Amino acid sequence: MNKSEKFFDRVSTKSKPEPNKTASKIIESSIEFLEKDKYVLDFGCGSGAITNKIAKEVKAIEAIDISSGMLGFAQKQAEENAITNIKYRQVSIFDEDLKNETFDVILAFNVLHYIEDMPNHVERINSLLKPNGIFISSTACMKEKRSLVRYLVSFLSKLGIVPKMNSYGKVELETLIENGNFEVIKSEKISKLPEYFIVMKKK
């Protein structure tokens, strides 16, 4: 078990079933790009607060995460709410069971700033999407604003208390994804952090 997995396992004990204000905004904005016949991959699904809410909008969801604690909480909430079209799995996005051109939509909420090898991950996301597939992400872009939160996160990360977080600017993040054979179709600020909701289409 690596440090990130241990951290999120600890955090999972404080998870709540209902999405917070920002997560609710993510759900609202995502629904525009979801349809009843779509097969979705939720990359870094966490506690399932978003996953379980959007399940009724799509055909099926494959939800993956590194944290067994988060997945356990998500699965329990799905069962309690009789949600049957989500498969929760503790695997990485590079798991060989995930086949190329399988998914209509891939979600990555509060995930990308933790990734060390972005180009490789973006390439993988692109390969898993069907032609013209949609990649929806929401990411804290800490370079956009000097704040106490930004410096505190950096300090805690250096101490190893929280996982390492990359500090992106909005345009920088969009360019990284675009370079993986995507085009931007929507980009909006959804929190004061600031966090950006970005929708990309596979070229």
Language model feature labels by segment:
Residues M1-E35, K143, V153-L156, S191-L193:
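Conserved class I S-adenosyl-L-methionine
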Residues Y39, G133-I134:
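Short glycine-centered segments of the SAM/dcSAM-binding site in methyltransferase folds
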Residues L41, S47-D95:
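Class I SAM-dependent methyltransferase SAM/SAH-binding core
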Residues L107:
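A conserved beta-strand element that flanks and buttresses the S-adenosyl-L-methionine
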Residues N110-V111:
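Short catalytic micro-motifs in class I SAM-dependent methyltransferases
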Residues P119-P131:
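A short glycine-rich, Lys/Arg-flanked "PGG" loop and its adjoining helix->strand segment in the class I
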Residues S138-G180, I185-E188:
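C-terminal alpha-helical "lid/dimerization" subdomain adjacent to the S-adenosyl-L-methionine
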Residues N181, K186-K203:
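Core SAM-dependent methyltransferase catalytic element
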